[in-house]
Structures are given as C-alpha cells and as structure tokens.
Amino acid sequence: GVDVSIAEYEKTTALTAKRMDAVYGYVVIEYKGPGKLASAAAVRKAKDQLKTYLEEESLRHGAETESSLEKAVGIALDDRHILFARYSKTARILSTPVPIEGQGVLFPEVRPQFGFHYQGPFPINASSLTSLLIYVRAAARRPLTAADLATVFGPEHEVANVLVSELYSAAMRGQRRSQFPRVATFYAEWDRLFGVVYGEKLEKAEKAAEETAMLYHLPTGIRLKSLLFAIHTFYAFLMKLIAIELLALQRDARVDSFVEGLAALDDAGVRTRLSELESGSGFQDRGISNFLEADFFSWYLDAWTGKLASAMRGAIRAMADFEPATPVLEPDWTRDLLQKLYELLVPKMLRHGLGEYYTPDWLAGYLVTKAGYDGAPGVRFLDPACGSGTFLVQAIHRAAQHAEKQDTVRIAEVGRAILDGVMGFDLNPLAVLAARTNYLIAFARFLPYVSPVSIPVYLCDSVLPPDREPENDNHQAELFSPDTVVF
C-alpha cells in the first residue's frame, strides 16, 4: 500500500473569510458533507473554493507564489466522490498519480491548457483514494529530480563516497583473491567489453584518476579501472532502485515499495532482497520482461561483507526519502534525470577523457524536430547508438503530445504504439540500462495500461547489423522500412 506515515497531521487554516479544512504541505483538502458533490452546481462551487484556497495559500510564499501554486494540489471530497485541482502556468494536460477506475480513454475531450485543471469528480474507490494518498505522501517526500538526487548521492556526500569506497575495495579484493571467482569474472568481462566501448581512451583518462579519487574521498594511488567499475556499479544500483520503485507504484498500487523497510533487515536479509532485485524477478513480476539482461553490476553480492551491507543500507535509506510518483506528477522534472546524475557521479575531466559527451535535452528536442518526427502512429523512431536514451525520451514525449491533440485516444493503444515504434541500440551495457530506465520513466503514464512490456532498447552493435536474405533475386532486402526515422 501507500505509506503516508511521514506526512504531518492535518491542520486547519483560515484564509480571509473562508476556512480550509486541512493542509498537508502543498495539499489542500476540502471535506464536504454526504452527497454534497452530487450536483453540477455543487461541483462548480467546490472548484471555485479550491481555486481560492490554493491561490490564497500560495500568497504565503511571497516571491515563490507562482512556483508554490504549481506544486499545490486541491482535493474536495464527500462520502461518495472526490475531485482534484492543479495549476499549470503553461499549457499542459495533467493526470492523477494512478488511473482512476472507469477511465477508458486518454484525456477524453481535453486539450492542453494553462491555469487551473480539474479532474473528476470520481467515485471514491481504491484507485481514487490511492491518488489522494500519493499526493499527501508526495508533499512530505523529496521529488525525484537530478538536483535533489545530487544533494544525497553526489560524490561529495557521505552516502556516495562510503558506498563507492566499499565497492572499490570489494572489486580489488575480488581481483586478488581466489575465493571471489565470480567477482573476478564479472570484472574481466566488464574490462573486455568496456575496452571495446572506450578503446584507447581508458589510457588517456588515467590522468583523471587522482581527481576522481579526491572527489570520492579516496586515497591517492587508486586504480582507475577498478574505481570506474565501482562507480558504474553504484550508478546501476541507483537506477535499479528508481525503476523498481516506479513499477511498484504503477503496476499495482497494492504492491509494496521495494525499499520500504529494507534497510531495517539484517545483513543476510538485505542480501537476499537485493539478490531478488538483481535476478530481475521483481521486474518480471511487475510486467517488465527484459529490464535486466547481460548485467555486469550484480557482482557485489558475491563480495558481501558487513561494511558493504552497511553502505548499501545508507543508499537504500536515502532512496526511500524520494517520491517515485514524480515522473507521473511532474513529468518535466524527470527529463535528463539519469544523464545529469551520471554527470555528477563521473567528473567532467574523466568523462571527456573517455570520450563521453552528452546531448543536452534542448538540443535533442531540436534535432528530433529537424528530423521530422512528430510522434504520429505508424512512423517508427530508431536511435542506433542511443546512449542513455535522451533521443528516445524525446520521441516518447512527442508520441504522447501527438495523442494529446486528438479528441479521444485509448491509453493502451498509445502505449503499445510507442513500444512498437520507439527503439534504440547500444553496445555499452551501462548505457542500455540507463536507456531502459529513462524509457520507463518517460513511459510511466502508460504502464498501468500495457502489460507485459518488453522495453525496445537492445544491447547490440548497430555497426554490424544482422544479415538478411534478399527478398528476391533482384533486390536486397531492406533492413529498415521507409517509415522509420533512423537517428
């Protein structure tokens, strides 16, 4: 279920001549008597009240009035119905955190708009009450944004430097000692494959080793490859936690959070639960068939120690403070999430030494526009070197925006069209994991309606495409159809 134990107890606040029944952070709740939302006139009155309450509450924040208003949620409910209100300063279409039972179409007869948005009234049921509880919980949790993640998981902070230090030590032990053969095997395979990805750039990046070590509060004289292996493992671990929490929310509101209570287990219990995570079974149980494939970053389970368990608990406990519903509540906040997180974890000098340069979100959007892709169904979008999935995310948003312009479009149809039409390849296993996670984040609003899901991001070398037999004696078969935008 949805844990709201962290939310403050409701308080009553009087504004001008009116009274707000309760405020949870930025959530304003107006309680109505039985049957008071049964008529159209009563609903109009409730909307006006919520609008007034939210505007007056936002004035308390002075210069932050408009931004606080965008973060506010108004809720009116009686014994049978519930109504939600949000504000947007730009033209948008807003949705509830989880789909309300009975909704069969995507934004029926709704166009993007700015100002106040009203959703409902909906019947009070499990899904509408879950949305209410998620709004309440979100008011007490940190948003899942790159800036907020950086304040906890950035290398200058304890969670990151303690865990990376322990992972580095574990990787070094695994290479030196025969009792950790799986660690040595994973490292050797990572070294081989990333040698193909980075080529001679790894040697050129050695001069960034000391800077990276200082960033993570490690002593001088570290081995760059082993440190990069540890940082990659840390980054992969964070992505897996983000993805499993998002799926726990979207697949079934009654599926428990993965991280909730995990840090309270003993060392063996934490390892058992993380083994389940790394096996991919948790993702498969939640309808994602291929999230973890050819993953090099579960090796730490074979180098498990008390110190490593303690460091893992620190990261798990910190992740539990973030709201997994952020990609649904505020989709724009989570764009570039993993790219920016990686840029924080791997310093610029090392990234550039490795030849890693990321495309800014605004430039990716511009290039997708110039390529002529508008998200129309029937047109496929392929990025054959997708990296962390920046262009794939842009394509998914274009497809959703195209759907929003229609009068009525069924959510499942849009979601399936995206899965069939937006795909990527990459040779880098870490990039594939990042792209799949970014794909899930961008696809979050469709997850409840499409199952099972196979994320169309594949680990392969697009420079060496598979051979195909000619369709006839005179014509070579086309690898891609004419309606595919190859990026």
Label the predicted regions.
Residues 1-73, 81-94, 106:
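A short, conserved, highly charged catalytic patch centered on acidic carboxylates
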Residues 4-13, 329, 333, 341-343, ...:
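SAM-dependent methyltransferase catalytic region
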Residues 17, 38-45, 178, 182, ...:
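Conserved aromatic-histidine-acidic binding/catalytic patches
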Residues 22, 28, 191-219, 334-349, ...:
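Active-site-adjacent bridging/hinge elements
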Residues 57, 61-175, 274-281:
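Mixed-charge intrinsically disordered linker/loop segments at interdomain junctions
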Residues 66-69, 252-265, 448-454:
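Short, glycine/acidic-rich hinge or "gate" loops at secondary-structure transitions
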Residues 142-268:
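DNA-processing P-loop NTPase/helicase core
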Residues 247-344:
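Long recognition/docking surfaces used for binding and targeting
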